[in-house]
């Protein structure tokens, strides 16, 4: 899994005002990998938690692996560095360990005030979704004319300038990843492809493809999700395996990914869950356990992003 810690804390959908304490709790529990994104609008809180623990002497910056993501409205080459610097300013960091292209799809660029301002107090944060999700009269996203291969060139420049140590992608299908890897003049391969992955969407083919190309896989939503009525925590197979190992269902779901050589980034703001989710290195699932969990696959994707389905680079029109 390269230099990426096997388990990280995701700040996706984390309740505003509670992220800083969650990050501090996570560092105390042993987390060193933190995953965030401009689109989550909580980079500032993540950074505050990190700075507090560094100031305490609990951890050093070089011990941490901090990842964030380029949003779709900033795929134009001239906007990539601006977007990265805005994230660094929000986090109050000098560099990122990993910067990801959040989706392969480029959207209409943001308001000029966003581009001109490197302050998080700009128009875009007063009306974040207006800027982040430009919609047409049919409530479908307005695309840009960008190509993610051009965006990648600007991402590579960030490595050269030292703003980021590694670059990667998220939500890319195998054809898109292959196109990127075959790009003439490629200077840096993506370190990882961050994808939705859980027992109802095992992503066997995409994981195999990525790993065969020496691109690691990072699993988001590893516990599924209860809001869509898909609660893996209550799945009887998962509960039975958890009982057999004396572990929680969440720990089984996280360990499942680790044994596939997949990096995993569960999210939580609850101290007990944060601690529990990283206590997954003192047991192993049997091959029988792994096979039973893999058999739960339904190819059920939760993060469909339907307002983008007409985009030329929508990633989910093919099987993987």
Swiss-Prot record:
Location(s) in or outside the cell: Cytoplasm
Entry's Gene Ontology cellular component terms: cytosol
Catalysis performed (reactions): 1,5-anhydro-D-glucitol + NADP(+) = 1,5-anhydro-D-fructose + NADPH + H(+)
CDD domains: AKR_AKR1E1-2
Site feature: Lowers pKa of active site Tyr: 69
PROSITE patterns: ALDOKETO_REDUCTASE_1, ALDOKETO_REDUCTASE_2
Entry comment describing in which tissues the protein is expressed: Specifically expressed in testis. Expressed in testicular germ cells and testis interstitial cells.
Pfam families given in the database record: Aldo_ket_red
Catalytic site: 40
Top-level enzyme category: oxidoreductase
Residues binding NADP(+): 35, 194, 265-277
Signal sequence bounds: none
Binding site for substrate: 102
GO terms assigned for molecular function: 1,5-anhydro-D-fructose reductase activity; aldose reductase (NADPH) activity; oxidoreductase activity
Keyword list, A-Z: Cytoplasm, NADP, Oxidoreductase
Coiled coil: none
Main location: cytoplasm
Keyword Cytoplasm (UniProt): yes
Keyword Translocase appears in the UniProt entry: no
Record function comment: Catalyzes the NADPH-dependent reduction of 1,5-anhydro-D-fructose (AF) to 1,5-anhydro-D-glucitol. Has low NADPH-dependent reductase activity towards 9,10-phenanthrenequinone (in vitro).
Family classification: Belongs to the aldo/keto reductase family.
Record-given protein name: 1,5-anhydro-D-fructose reductase
Classification of source organism: Eukaryota, Metazoa, Chordata, Craniata, Vertebrata
Gene giving rise to this polypeptide: AKR1E2
